Structures are given as structure tokens and as C-alpha cells.
């Protein structure tokens, strides 16, 4: 099977030039909603798109608002610090920024799924459900309602169109960061309308790009565990939210 590039970011480390190799419209006529988290990956995704002249809108989802005791003990995905960082990056890039509340659908489709899995003695993967129901359903439809042409995220994955005319999901070039598995729930309707600008980059290069562009999150640590459990204590979370189910 032969492949043709979709609108995926291509980076030349020698000339520092970059381009999207396919688009039905020129960048300045193309609107992209960028899912921002306040982390380095989504921030660099936004920066690369802005540099190419795309009309970007930064959107951050308020997914969960569990609070713990002590300073800084909020869940990682929606902490005030993360919101502040995402807003700072958007201001630095000169793009609009919106924070939208999706707590109810997130609880129904992700948190309840997580609790149900543990109550049945299986290990759930809530990231798959989040991508299926929240990022690439709720947020993608939100982007479409805004009139955007694409939704971009900071996932380490790539897209290619085969000679069968279908969009195929490929691994990111950084095997240690590849996220194609958690995106495997996406169908053609979603893959046609999404972009993964950093999928062709190793993580170290993404951090270098962030530092070179002066993004305020360039040295921010990655979030490795479930974003909605602020202290990574599964037992405490399940006892708090699912005592009757356990």
C-alpha cells in the first residue's frame, strides 16, 4: 500500500522550516481547535500550527474537580495551575482561549466506567473511553459547532492516507511516547477531522521546540498517571467514590 501525507506536521531540523503537506484550504483560511492541557505537548502542537498560519483556537476541558487536603492537591487534569499554564501559552501565541466544563459527560463515560471495571474485578483503561467519548466525540463536535476545520491534540501519533482512500493511524516516531493504542477507538469520521502535529517528533525535540519558542511550560513535568486521581491513590479514590460498589 502506498501512502500520502495528511495535514501532518513535517519538521526539517536543518532549515527549521515546517509545513503541512496537504490541506484543502490555505492555512490562513483553515481554523483549528487545539485541545490544550497546560502541558508541553499540546502547547507545542498549538505553536507549530500558529507558526504555519493556521487560525487556532485553544480549548481546555474541565474534566474533573476533585479536591484533596493540602496545598496543590487537586487532580492533575484540571488544576488551577494547568488552566493558568494553558492560558499563558495561548496569550503567548496570540490565540483565543476557552475553558469548557465537561464534568458530567466525563463522569458518566470515564469515571463511572473506571469504577465499574474495578467493581467487576477487571482493570479498565479510562484513557480509551476518554478518547472515544470526550476528546474525539464531545470536543470534536464542539470544534465542528465552532466552524473549525480540524481538532488538533498533542498526541504522539501520525496519520496517513492509503491508496484505498482511507485515513490510517500510525505510531508516533517516538516509540517510548507512542499513543496510537489509545487512539485506536477512532473511526474514519474522526480521523478525517483531526491533526497530531507532534507525531513526527521525538519527545526531546518537542521540549527543545518549546524552549526555543520561549513557551512557559517548556520544562514542565509530564503527567504519567490517571489525570482525575489527584494523588494517584486508586484505593482512596474508589473508597471515596465507589464504596458501595466495592
Question: Regions from the language model: what does each represent?
Answer:
Residues 14-185, 195, 203-206:
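ATP-dependent adenylation/nucleotidyltransferase module used to activate substrates
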Residues 6:
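Acidic, metal/ion-coordinating pockets
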Residues 13-14, 103, 227, 246:
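Intrinsic disorder/low-complexity detector
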Residues 185-246:
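Internal nucleotide-binding/catalytic subdomain
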Amino acid at each position: 500500500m502506498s501512502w500520502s501525507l495528511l495535514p501532518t506536521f513535517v519538521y526539517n531540523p536543518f532549515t527549521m522550516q515546517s509545513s503541512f503537506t496537504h490541506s484543502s484550504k490555505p492555512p490562513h483560511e483553515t481554523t483549528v481547535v487545539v485541545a490544550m492541557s497546560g502541558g508541553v505537548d499540546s502547547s507545542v502542537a498549538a505553536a507549530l500550527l500558529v507558526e504555519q498560519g493556521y487560525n487556532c483556537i485553544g480549548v481546555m476541558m474541565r474534566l474533573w474537580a476533585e479536591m484533596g487536603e493540602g496545598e496543590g492537591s487537586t487532580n492533575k487534569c484540571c488544576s488551577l495551575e494547568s488552566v493558568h499554564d494553558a492560558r499563558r501559552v495561548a496569550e503567548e501565541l496570540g490565540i483565543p482561549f476557552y475553558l469548557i466544563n465537561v464534568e458530567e459527560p466525563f463522569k458518566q463515560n470515564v469515571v463511572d466506567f473506571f469504577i465499574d471495571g474495578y467493581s467487576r474485578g477487571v482493570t479498565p483503561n479510562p484513557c480509551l473511553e476518554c478518547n472515544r467519548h470526550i476528546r474525539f466525540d464531545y470536543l470534536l463536535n464542539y470544534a465542528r459547532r465552532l466552524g473549525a476545520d480540524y481538532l488538533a491534540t498533542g498526541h504522539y501519533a501520525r496519520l496517513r492516507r492509503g491508496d484505498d482512500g482511507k485515513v490510517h493511524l500510525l505510531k508516533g516516531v517516538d516509540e517510548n511516547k507512542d499513543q496510537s493504542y489509545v487512539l485506536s477507538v477512532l473511526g474514519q469520521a474522526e480521523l478525517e477531522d483531526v491533526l497530531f502535529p507532534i507525531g513526527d517528533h521525538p519527545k526531546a525535540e518537542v521540549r527543545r521546540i518549546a524552549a526555543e519558542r520561549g513557551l512557559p511550560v517548556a520544562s514542565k513535568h509530564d503527567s504519567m498517571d490517571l489525570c482525575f486521581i489527584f494523588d494517584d491513590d486508586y484505593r482512596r479514590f474508589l473508597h471515596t467514590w465507589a464504596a458501595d460498589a466495592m
